[in-house]
Amino acid sequence: QTNWNTDFIVDQPYTSFKFFFTANSADPGAQYPVSGFMKFSDGSNLQVINETMNPPIGTGRMFGPFPAIPGKQASQMNFKVGASNDPGALGFSYRISVQGCR
């Protein structure tokens, strides 16, 4: 089972959110689409990350902090890491996490 599309549960109110990505392996020329969404209890969402990365192995990247949206209750943070179009990039591994900040 891959984790290219991962939801992180938000179980309390936070003032902002940070997304973290670290490549454990990568093909030197491969490009990976990365996107992140704030999902809300009313079913709506807001895209906060939309870019293509060529991550060096062992290098981390923080996205954010993204402020909480007034009047909206965050229910999940969603992180998507897509596949590269480069066939040599198969087997790419990475770590992702999301942090809620008070």
Where are these regions (language model features)?
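Exposed low-complexity, polar/acidic, P/S/T/G-rich flexible segments that act as propeptides
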Residues: 36-38, 44, 82-102
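Noncatalytic modules at the cell exterior or secretory-pathway interfaces
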Residues: 19, 65-92
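Short, surface-exposed beta-strand/strand-loop-strand elements in extracellular ectodomains
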Residues: 29-52
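Short, solvent-exposed coil/turn segments at beta-strand boundaries
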Residues: 16, 41-44, 72-74
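Short, surface-exposed binding/anchoring microloops in extracellular/periplasmic proteins
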Residues: 1-34
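Glycine-centered loop/turn motifs
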Residues: 31, 58-60, 74-76
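Beta-sandwich interaction modules
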Residues: 3-12, 56-71
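Mature soluble domains of exported/periplasmic/lumenal proteins and thiol-rich metal-chelating peptides
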Residues: 11-15, 32, 49, 53-54, ...
